[in-house]
Each structure stands twice: as C-alpha cells, then as structure tokens.
Regions:
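Short, basic, low-complexity termini and linkers enriched in Ser/Thr/Gly/Pro
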Residues: 1, 6-17, 23-27, 423-424
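Glycan-processing catalytic domains of CAZymes
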Residues: 34-379, 385-421
Length: 424
C-alpha cells in the first residue's frame, strides 16, 4: 500500500488482495537505477514514535497526533501534509509522488519524480520516503531499484520499507523457507538504512507464539548490519485480530525496547470503520480508549528514547517459560537471579562501557514485584524515571558478592537500570 490505509483494508488483507489479483511487480527496468556508490549517509538522531493509518491533513487532526506524543507519520502521506506536519513538529514519510515501478519506467515521469524529491528534500518535516509495504521476496528487485532511485536523488533521508512478519500467511519463508534468509536478501538488495516489520500477536483465535522469535531475528539482522529497527506495534483490532488491552500495549512497547528497538510505529491510528472503535481515532474524530493509552505510553517513550538511542544492545534474556526463539537467562551471567514472575531482560552498554538493564514484566495482565540480584557489588545503582525524565537512586542491598534490588512493575511494564562501578 502506497499512501493512506483505506478504512476496510489491513496490511495482511491488502497482501491477500494483491496475491489474489496477481498484482506482482515486474522485474526492475527503471531508468537511472544503477546502484549508488556512496554509503548511506542517514543516521537516526531521535527516537521515532510514529503512526500508521494517517488522518487527513487537517489542523485539528494533526494537533491530536502531536498531543498524543507522536513525532512522525510513517504512512506515505502526500506533499500537502508537509507544512501542516511542520506546524505541529511532526515528521512525515512522504509518498504519493510517483515513487513506483510503473511511473519510473517512463523517462519523463521519472524526471518528474526526481524533481519532486529535489523540491521536498530540504523540507524540515521530511523524515523519509515510503517505498514498500509487506514486501514479498519476489518484489525485492523492484523495491531495491526504488530505494536506489530515492537514495541517489536524496541520500540524506531514508526509505521506509515494511517487511512481512515471520509467520505471514504466505509462509514464514516466502520463497526460500527461511525468514532470516528473507531478511538477509532484503538487506543485500535494498541496502536499507533501517528495518521495519509488523508482527501483530493478539488474535481472535489464539495469540501468536512467534512474536519473540520475530523480534530476535530482526534484532540479529539489525546488529549484524548496523541498522536501527522500528517494529510496528498493534494498537487496534480488525477481522482476525482482537483489541489489545492496556497491559498488552505496554508489553509491546517495552519488549520492543528490551530487544533494542530505536523507535516504534503504532498501527492503526486512523482508518477503521466508523463506529467500530477498532483504531485509536475514528473517522468522525472520536478518540477511542486506546488514544489515552498510546498517549501515556508515548510519554514514557519520549523520555526513555533519548537515553536508549545511543546505547549498544548486548543481549536479551527471558525467565520463566522460554518463548519460541528466545534465550533463557544464563545461570552464571551478570544477573544471578530474577524473581517475581516471567521477565524479559535487555542488556545494553553505553559508550563508556557502563552496563544498563531493561527489565520487563512479561505478564501483561498482572503487576509484579521484581527481586533482582546482580552478580557483583555495585556502587550507585540507578533507575531512569520517565515521569521525571531523570535518573534516580535505586534502593539496593550490597554485600561482597552481589547487589540485590526490589521494585514493582505494572502489567507489561519495564524499568531501565544503570549499573554503577563494581566496588571490588
């Protein structure tokens, strides 16, 4: 889908329609599509908090987007949204300028698209260019050519390409039998500056068991290639998908952070059928209960994002029953024990080598008290308080061998800890 999501179509229904109609893209034969020889120059400077399902570009609607704590619209909006987005300090992923194979196959039209890119590349609201949604492996050559075209004419802004989840109904393998291979082929072909995917786990007929596996595979690919990744998080219901609870939406956000996400994209903000209460905002402007939930979570993300953005992901571990594709907390690691429920723990380092731990309650329905033992005596254990946007001292008991801390977490919530220097 290039452009705004229609009210009755989801990413997976659009894919089914495309396959049913045989809308496979032809192999690339675009003019001026030779691969650029310069490296990708774009690097993320802020933590992305974006939406899919863009509202019409009207002042009251964009004001609502900004008030909910978003800083970007990642939905291939038209150029008419740029000035309005800038008014509300929003960035946009630009679409609707002809960045598609059919248009670029005509030399005159390709020149017009290049002119459009040059016209908008210095706009302060421009975040990047929308190129592909739920990309099939058979589309990689086309998507790569589109990405090259955009990158040649504007190397300072990334292309936004959404990838399929590992359990897509066409098969996790798509054409190869291996989702990791699908990711590798995509990265080699398109040379993206970022990875985006959507794995929507909350389903009417049983939740997905492959959510953490998908996060892990994306995480590995992102680390191997030095790319940030931005998962699309489920904030709505549609046929086959149930509405997530507040705890589940918090769980989505914090588990993504634990795995090293450098931003998130909430779906679906706008475009659900009127009266369905399936999205965040209805077509008549009615705010559903999920608007307040997302706004609260975005406030946390705006506070945590600048702290997490420069940290280097080191490892991710689980306690309790280990989900598919996850790694169990080792017995003899940095953490000696983690009690109180099932948890996800993301381990990070800053530029100076200081260890950080993001501890996430894997129970999305129940608040828990965490008892955490660090296998070294730590001087100055601290936690980051999103409401104060500051580090605070974490109460801790220290002996010769361990540091033990206790704290509470809401359903699906997390706490970022910074370990001080060892005292021995």
């Amino acid at each position: 889908m290039l452009g705004r999501l229609s009210p009755l179509r989801t990413p997976h229904s659009a894919l089914r329609t495309a396959l049913a109609c045989g809308l496979w893209l032809a192999a690339c034969s675009l003019p001026a599509c030779s691969r650029p020889r310069t490296p990708q120059e774009w690097q993320p400077r802020e933590f992305l908090i974006a939406l899919r399902g863009a509202p019409p570009p009207k002042p009251p609607l964009y004001a609502q987007v900004a008030q909910a704590g978003f800083n970007a619209i990642a939905d291939g909006v038209g150029s008419d949204a740029l000035d309005l987005a800038h008014r509300y300090r929003l960035k946009v992923v630009l679409g609707q300028i002809g960045l598609d194979t059919a248009t670029l196959s005509r030399p005159a039209d390709a020149r017009n698209v290049a002119d459009a890119i040059r016209r908008f590349d210095s706009h302060p609201a421009l975040w990047g260019y929308f190129v592909g949604d739920e990309t099939l492996e058979s589309q990689l050559a086309d998507v790569a050519a589109l990405a090259d075209f955009a990158r040649r004419h504007d190397p300072m802004h990334p292309v936004f390409i959404s990838l399929l989840p590992c359990d897509a109904w066409v098969g996790p393998a798509l054409a190869t039998g291996d989702y990791a291979d699908y990711l590798e082929r995509f990265i080699r072909a398109a040379r993206p500056a970022l990875l985006n995917f959507g794995h929507f786990p909350f389903r009417e007929k049983g939740d997905s068991e492959f959510y953490f596996e998908n996060l892990e595979l994306i995480r590995r690919a992102a680390l191997e290639h030095g790319l940030p990744f931005y998962p699309t998080l489920q904030a709505a219901s549609w046929p086959g998908m149930r509405p997530p609870t507040e705890g589940e939406m918090r769980w989505l956000a914090y588990t993504a952070l634990a795995y090293g996400a450098k931003g998130v994209v909430w779906f679906r903000y706008w475009g659900a059928p009127a009266g369905s209460r399936q999205g965040i905002v209805e077509p008549d402007g009615l705010l559903t209960e999920r608007y307040r939930i997302v706004a609260d979570l975005n406030a946390d993300l705006r506070a945590l994002g600048p702290v997490l953005l420069p940290l280097r992901p080191v490892a991710v571990y689980h306690t309790g029953p280990t989900p598919v594709g996850a790694t169990r907390l080792p017995i003899h690691g940095l953490l000696g024990a983690l009690e109180g429920g099932p948890f996800v723990v993301g381990e990070f380092e800053d530029a100076g080598g200081a260890k950080h731990l993001l501890v996430v309650n894997r129970d999305a329905a129940r608040a828990v008290t965490v008892k955490l033992a660090i296998n070294r005596p730590c001087k100055g254990l601290a936690w980051f308080d999103p409401s104060a946007r500051a580090w605070a001292a974490q109460a801790v008991e220290v002996d010769r061998f361990q540091s033990v801390a206790e704290f509470s977490l809401p359903p699906g919530g997390g706490r970022l800890l910074r370990l001080g220097k060892a005292t021995r």
